C-alpha cells in the first residue's frame, strides 16, 4: 500500500489498518479485503457492545488509530453492556459480517487469531474474560 495522504501519521495509520484486514483475510485464505473488513468490524462491534464502557475503553486503548475508529463507529455507550446470549451474539455477528449463521464460530475464532497477531494474549484475555463463557468460547482462537 503506497502513501496517499502525504501525512506520515495518516499513511502509517492506513497501512496498519490494511495489515489488520489483510491478517483477517489470511486467516480465511482469501484475498477478499471487503469480506475481511466486514468480519473484523463485526468482531469489534459485537465484542464492544457486550463489554462495559470501562472495559471497552481499556480494550480500545490498545488498538491502532483507524481500528479504534472502527471499534467505536456507531457506539452508544448508554446502552452497553448489551446482555445477549451466545445465540443472539452469533445472529448479530452473522448479520453484521453478512455471513451465514453456520460460519460464525469459524469467523469469530479466526478473527480473534488475526487480532492476536497484534495484541498481546493477556490483553485479549482481559477483554474476553468479561464475556459469558458461551460467547467467549465462540471467540477464542486456538493458540
Go through the PLM ranges and name each one.
Residues 67-121:
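Short, solvent-exposed interaction modules
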Amino acid at each position: 500500500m503506497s502513501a496517499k495522504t502525504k501525512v506520515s501519521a495518516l499513511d502509517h495509520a492506513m497501512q496498519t489498518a490494511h495489515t489488520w484486514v489483510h491478517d483477517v483475510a489470511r486467516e480465511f485464505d482469501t484475498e477478499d479485503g471487503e469480506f475481511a473488513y466486514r468480519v473484523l468490524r463485526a468482531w469489534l462491534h459485537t465484542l464492544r457492545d457486550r463489554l462495559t464502557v470501562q472495559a471497552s475503553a481499556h480494550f480500545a486503548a490498545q488498538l491502532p488509530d483507524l481500528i479504534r475508529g472502527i471499534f467505536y463507529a456507531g457506539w452508544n455507550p448508554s446502552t452497553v453492556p448489551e446482555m445477549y446470549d451466545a445465540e443472539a451474539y452469533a445472529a448479530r455477528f452473522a448479520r453484521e459480517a453478512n455471513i451465514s449463521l453456520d460460519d460464525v464460530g469459524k469467523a469469530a475464532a479466526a478473527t480473534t487469531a488475526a487480532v492476536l497477531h497484534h495484541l498481546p494474549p493477556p490483553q485479549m484475555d482481559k477483554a474476553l474474560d468479561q464475556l459469558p463463557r458461551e460467547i467467549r468460547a465462540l471467540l477464542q482462537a486456538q493458540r
